[in-house]
Amino acid sequence: MTVERLENGVIVQRNTNEIEISITLDTVHGKLEGSTGVNFFDHLLNTFCHYSGLGLRVSTCESKDGILHHLIEDFGISLGLAFRELFDYTKVRRFGEATVPMNEALVGCYVDLSGRPFFQKNFEFSVEKIEDMPVEGFEEFMCGFVNHARITVHFFKFFGKNDHHISESAMKSFGLAIAKALESSEKKTTKGVID
């Protein structure tokens, strides 16, 4: 894995026996450019970019073994590492939360840019795939992102039956919570450092 710093962004390249990924995460564009090859995953990523205000350019996203689980998990790893490299958690608000309705679904997201990776959600999906994406990919992506960004993320589903609506409500709330957590702040952690 290689990391290259830019003025307003970070390029991460990850090449394993299973996948090849090259992405750029920036603070400028606020949208997804390019494709992972998984339409619904692209939809969720674009949703995250729109509501977080972050830009994501996918230059390369190829599966060498044809297993979507690996592709989506490694994409989360790459994006999480880019996020950690791009931001100094000691100079931002750190905490963010948002609750977003989408039709019958209502999901809240609670974020701490703590340096301590932890992911939790209180819901499971009722189908095996949403459009062309295996539902296990949602958690695999989030775990990859959280572990390498070194942040804490909780999702709480208040209501929801339609898995498309639930996942999109979750990703919108995640984007908004991240945007809030990244607001500039002079308030320091009581510990004095974020590892």
Curated annotation (Swiss-Prot):
Its main location: cytoplasm. GO terms for biological process: L-histidine biosynthetic process. The keyword Cytoplasm applies. Gene3D superfamilies: Imidazole glycerol phosphate dehydratase, domain 1. InterPro entries: IGPD_sf, ImidazoleglycerolP_deHydtase, ImidazoleglycerP_deHydtase_CS, Ribosomal_Su5_D2-typ_SF. It is found in: Cytoplasm. Belongs to the imidazoleglycerol-phosphate dehydratase family. HAMAP family: HisB. This is Imidazoleglycerol-phosphate dehydratase. It comes from Thermotoga maritima (strain ATCC 43589 / DSM 3109 / JCM 10099 / NBRC 100826 / MSB8). The gene is hisB.
